[in-house]
Swiss-Prot record:
Protein name: Band 4.1-like protein 1
In-chain residues carrying the UniProt-annotated modification Phosphotyrosine: 343
Biased composition, class Low complexity, residue ranges: 17-35
Organism: Rattus norvegicus
Keyword Phosphoprotein: yes
Length: 879
């Protein structure tokens, strides 16, 4: 488009189009203002010139000529085209703001960001400055007018989030990785260590004296390197901070431990630091002040597995993400809707009172982000549409599954970075593919502070391991080489958060006591692919790597779908997924078992660190009622030689209870335990491969398999009942006789949380409050007699055993907490005599498989036997 110039053309245009006069006059009299801001004089001038449009054309000509002298390109200003923009927008310059970010090492980073820039722009600048690629675990925080910490939303403009004039931010960890060893790069672990050290110093991560010393020694090793007698003299750690109340005794203990580390690089020291810190009860818990319905001050903690409730620094409840149907807030109230249990009809809503509306919204956002990051495979897109009920806020970053996949693709040399006060080993050594074993001092338990979500059952018992306790199971961990199944199923790897490894020791102690009770010296923690000599090692010996060569962490294997370690199977045709070598070894071991005539209890050490069903913390009161008709009470505690003399040549390897764990229907599997999976229902078909797949799932619970010969003269009618306390008392006469003997086989190997309440047989142990009930079901009973080949789960032979199961569930609510007692009565009958010890142990094992989170408190057995033909002949003769 061309523009006419000169006085004649301007006069002509001004006379023809008088509406252009106000615009030209306004352009002359109004100073240039920033874009988006209108000067008040402009509006007044426009209004004045519009009302009085009687000025001659020569005045506009003079004004426009004056504008030509003042600015270039005025011809565009006088063109009548509506497509032309004002000169203010043409001359617009983007304004920038100075951002000051406090990093994790207490240094500050300043940068210029566009004033209308989004939070993601600033976050990317900080991560680029830090040379950080695994940045999804981190975030930026700022303080509002109430000095409350808020997370900077990367999808919104910065100026709309922060109101204060100086833009000050802090770079912190937003999502604490459940397993820091899976981080790919040393620099990521280094910044995580800095965050944890800051949490410990400020008291947000409480721990004991021993833990302070252990973590402090690794921090010193990472910063100062190996101990040097010439350089490190006196109290050389006094300048470093390790605890909120640092004492001389703590510093001396740290120096003693530091002297023992030789040749440990800073990267290795940081890995040991993180391996211990992740077991702390408050690791990764974001606390928020609130009040409950009664107005009592509580703390709401948000973590990877769900929502935690604390009162007086003690965790009183836990709601896992799969149990939460909906989270919402209204004004200053925060609500969570809980999924109904198996025996409940409606959902329940729990409300909390927060200090103000902003606090409720802040907590709601944190819950949304944590749930999306740790539980979902990909972030949920925000709702679209003009009218949308509720907030449109959604987490917009990458989830943990996506960031692990992206981290596996990182292929760059280990970045160089200088640690805070490091005097040696400043070059970060890449640990990709390297294996390390944690020293004995790492096996410390941390019970200080509120109970965290990874330690669900052991925290109530209050046990504390020493830092050099036996039984530490730690196998090598690979850092960079992530297996495909670990990447594609990230949610299953979350399950290991629920229980730490100290639960393993309690189960081992239970096995030891069971071993003494049954006079069996060879009760061991057994791996499927070990040879028999290694299976006879002590239970405290560490586990060997898995056959596949994958990193075998007891906490991680509970969530991954691997083969079961149960050995209750006779020699049979190899299943498609089994190995030829494994099958041969299994047959040889079966022969050894039957030859020794021993009651061997097989258990896998990693199966003890199983994640419990997310929010189910009730315990079961199992009553196996023992009443003997037609014979005197037979002592369960008699030694194995006595049992061996009563045995005949007929042999069996026990009953295999195929199980089907039913959970609430959800798009998400339980974050800490029973999961809805297509593999769970595999036992409904009678083919052998499906049955094998069900056995492969039993690794996620404590597996207890028992082999024994059958007693010819007795038929066992075993009833594992689950009932109310009144029903338990109904079987008290027989229960009292049973509990006078020490057959702790029934409960000692299954109890994980409470004290030994089995020796007293009067009543049940104290209940653990839990919000919901466990949903389980026994689908089929598969008898395996002798060496017959299992062809159908319903195959009937002359020796087939039949069962009938009756379940009673009693639930009481006290003070907002529900107590659940399940009494399950199992009656086993058959044409063949049944080994009472074997059937009892298998019944208890099946109960534990169905209710992994609940405690078996009582087991009593009724035994009914029909008189033998000789006895029938004797009775008429005597009469």
């Amino acid at each position: 488009m061309t523009t006419e110039t000169g006085p004649d053309s301007e006069v002509k245009k001004a006379q023809e189009e008088t509406p252009q006069q106000p615009e030209a006059a306004a352009a002359v009299t109004t100073p240039v203002t920033p874009a988006g801001h209108s000067h008040p004089e402009t509006n007044s001038n426009e209004k004045h010139l519009t009302q009085q449009d009687t000025r001659p054309a020569e005045q506009s000509l003079d004004m426009e000529e004056k504008d030509y002298c003042e600015a270039d390109g005025l011809s565009e200003r006088t063109t009548p085209s509506k497509a032309q923009k004002s000169p203010q927008k043409i001359a617009k310059k983007f304004k920038s703001a100075t951002c000051r970010v406090t990093l994790l090492d207490a240094s500050e980073y300043e940068c210029e960001v566009e004033k209308h820039g989004r939070g993601q722009v600033l976050f990317d600048l900080v991560c680029e400055h830090l040379n950080l690629l695994e940045k999804d675990y981190f975030g930026l925080t700022f303080c509002d007018a109430d000095s409350q910490k808020n997370w900077l939303d990367p999808s919104k403009e910065i100026k709309k989030q922060i109101r204060s004039s100086p833009w000050n931010f802090a770079f912190t960890v937003k999502f604490y990785p459940p397993d820091p060893a899976q981080l790919t790069e040393d620099i990521t672990r280094y910044y995580l260590c800095l965050q944890l050290r800051a949490d410990i110093i400020t008291g947000r991560l409480p721990c004991s004296f021993v833990t302070h010393a252990l973590l402090g020694s690794y921090a010193v090793q990472a910063e100062l390197g190996d101990h040097d007698t010439e350089e490190h003299v006196g109290n050389y750690v006094s300048e470093l901070r390790f605890a909120p109340n640092q004492t001389r005794e703590l510093e001396e203990r740290i120096m003693e431990l530091h002297k023992t580390y030789r040749g440990m690089t800073p990267g290795e020291a940081e890995i040991h630091f993180l391996e211990n810190a992740k077991k702390l009860s408050m690791y990764g818990v974001d606390l928020h002040h609130a009040k409950d319905s009664e107005g009592i001050d509580i703390m709401l903690g948000v973590c990877a597995n769900g929502l935690l409730i604390y009162r007086d620094r003690l965790r009183i409840n836990r709601f896992a993400w799969p149990k939460i149907l909906k989270i919402s807030y209204k004004r200053s109230n925060f609500y969570i809707k809980i999924r109904p249990g198996e025996y409940e009809q409606f959902e329940s809503t729990i409300g909390f009172k927060l200090p103000n509306h902003r606090s409720a919204k802040r907590l709601w956002k944190v819950c949304i982000e944590h749930h999306t990051f740790f539980r979902l495979v990909s972030p949920e897109p925000p709702p679209k549409g003009f009218l949308v009920m509720g907030s449109k806020f959604r987490y917009s970053g990458r989830t943990q599954a996506q960031t692990r996949q992206a981290s596996a693709l990182i292929d760059r040399p280990a970045p160089f970075f200088e640690r805070s006060s490091s005097k040696r080993y400043t070059m970060s050594r890449s640990l990709d593919g390297a294996e390390f074993s944690r020293p004995a001092s790492v096996s410390e338990n941390h019970d200080a502070g509120p109970d965290g979500d990874k330690r669900e059952d052991d925290a109530e018992s209050g046990g504390r391991r020493s830092e050099a306790e036996e039984g530490e199971v730690r196998t090598p961990t690979k850092i960079k080489e992530l297996k495909p199944e670990q990447e594609t199923t990230p949610r299953h790897k979350q399950e290991f958060l629920d229980k730490p490894e100290d639960v393993l020791l309690k189960h081992q102690a239970s096995i030891n006591e069971l071993k003494r009770t049954l006079k069996e010296p060879n009760s061991k923690l057994i791996h499927r692919d070990r040879d028999w000599e290694r299976e006879r090692r002590l239970p405290s010996s560490p586990a060997s790597p898995s056959p596949k060569g994958t990193p075998e962490k007891a906490s991680e294997r509970a969530g991954l779908r691997e083969g079961s370690e149960e050995k209750v199977k006779p020699p049979r045709p190899r299943a498609p997924e089994s190995d030829t070598g494994d099958e041969d070894q299994d047959q040889e071991r079966d022969a050894v078992f039957l030859k020794d005539n021993h009651l061997a209890i097989e258990r896998k050490c990693s199966s003890i660190t199983v994640s419990s069903t997310s929010s189910l913390e009730a315990e079961v009161d199992f009553t196996v009622i023992g009443d003997y008709h037609g014979g005197a009470f037979e002592d369960f505690s008699r030694s194995l030689p006595e049992l061996d003399r009563d045995k005949s040549d007929s042999e069996t390897e026990g009953l295999v209870f195929a199980r089907d764990l039913k959970g609430p229907s959800s798009q998400e599997d339980e974050s800490g335990g029973i999961e809805d999976s297509p593999d769970r229902g595999a036992c409904s078909t009678p083919e052998l491969p499906q049955f094998e797949s069900v056995k492969a799932e039993t690794m996620t619970v404590s597996s207890l398999a028992i082999r024994k010969k059958i007693e010819p003269e007795a038929m066992l009618q075993s009833r594992v009942s689950t009932a109310d306390s009144t029903q338990v008392d109904g079987g008290a006469p027989a229960a009292k006789d049973f509990m006078t003997t020490p057959p702790c086989i029934t409960t000692e190997t299954i109890s994980t949380t409470m004290e030994n309440s089995l020796k007293s047989g009067k009543g049940a142990a104290a209940m653990i409050p839990g919000p919901q009930t466990v949903a389980t079901e026994i689908r089929s009973l598969s008898p395996i007699i002798g060496k017959d080949v299992l062809t159908s789960t319903y195959g009937a032979t002359a020796e087939t055993l039949s069962t009938s199961t009756t379940t009673h569930v009693t639930k009481t609510v006290k003070g907002g907490f529900s107590e659940t007692r399940i009494e399950k009565r199992i009656i086993i009958t058959g044409d063949e005599d049944v080994d009472q010890d074997q059937a009892l142990a298998l019944a208890i094992k099946e109960a534990k498989l169905q209710h992994p989170d609940m405690l078996v408190t009582k087991a009593v057995v009724y035994r009914e036997t029909d008189p033998s033909p000789e006895e029938r002949d004797k009775k008429p003769q005597e009469s």
